[in-house]
């Protein structure tokens, strides 16, 4: 099954219930599965049924991703003598948590008693927060990968003039890429402040 079809189905059934759609993909899939009865005969395992998850599982075999670690393991990895993950990955994760908090307030506001006529307004804000959160989560590993590319470039052979030229170009390309990633993080963090600002102004004050 295509991931988009499952997510769209989850949003559809949530909207029919006038519930916020700004929730995790995992929750949207769960709603779709329950509403469509896909688990009536046997358990529905998204990792084995959804095309994108199957391909991602195959592509990531043997690769350790930061975002798959527990919080404790992530902190321990950061504290280790390895130079990565560093400030860039940590900043991206902190930004993702900030976006998640904005979505939390939006979701709580969407379901606040007495605000029934505003559920869709807050649902839209929760969706925006989720988009920023998703992008920033991706940047957690992307920042560390960018750093590793620089290290790989520096390790290239440099005996002949051709090798030296190829190594220099690889270092320049990797360094340029490594500057683009934190810029993306800053841009996403800045833009997600719009959700935090809106929720501070119009969101549930008890949230």
Residue ranges with predicted function:
Residues 1, 78-105, 206-207:
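Conserved phosphate/anionic-ligand binding catalytic regions in large, soluble enzymes, centered on
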Residues 1-69, 166, 170:
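Long, contiguous binding/interaction regions
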Residues 61-70, 76, 184, 188-195:
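Polytopic transmembrane helical bundles with strong interfacial aromatic enrichment
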Residues 65-85, 201-205:
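Short, hydrophobic/aliphatic alpha-helical segments
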Residues 90-97, 125, 132-139, 174, ...:
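Amphipathic alpha-helix face/heptad-repeat signature
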Residues 108-119, 199-207:
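Inter-helical turn/loop segments and adjacent helix faces that build the functional surface
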Residues 111-157:
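A structural-propensity feature for long, helix-poor, extended segments
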Residues 143-207:
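Amphipathic alpha-helical interface segments
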